Amino acid sequence: MARKAFKVRRGLYKKGLVEDHHVIPRQHATHPTVKRFGYDMNASSNLVMLPTDKGKEILRLREGRLIHGGKHARYNRYVGNILNVITTEEELCAFTDFLKVGCRYRPQDIPWH
């Protein structure tokens, strides 16, 4: 609910300007690492708001900002490959933190399209 309230307050709700991005993609919900540590795919900690093409233009966001829309197959593959080698919950938390920073501020650190 907090995410919706934030979008409403900022004038973003149902305007097609932003979309919620699952940091660990939903396709990995049954991955052994995700299941082993009981990672909640729908928790707010697994979501980041990313602009759409329309949002990037209207909100006048910085150049290089990741755009959410369509598929991001390279990202999903990358996340799956890293999940394959994670052995501790601490590693999983560190990886999700790394992905959040990559999605928001350092897109050069993660593959996208």
PLM regions and their residue ranges:
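Catalytic toxin/effector domains delivered as secreted proteins or via bacterial secretion systems
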Residues: 1-113
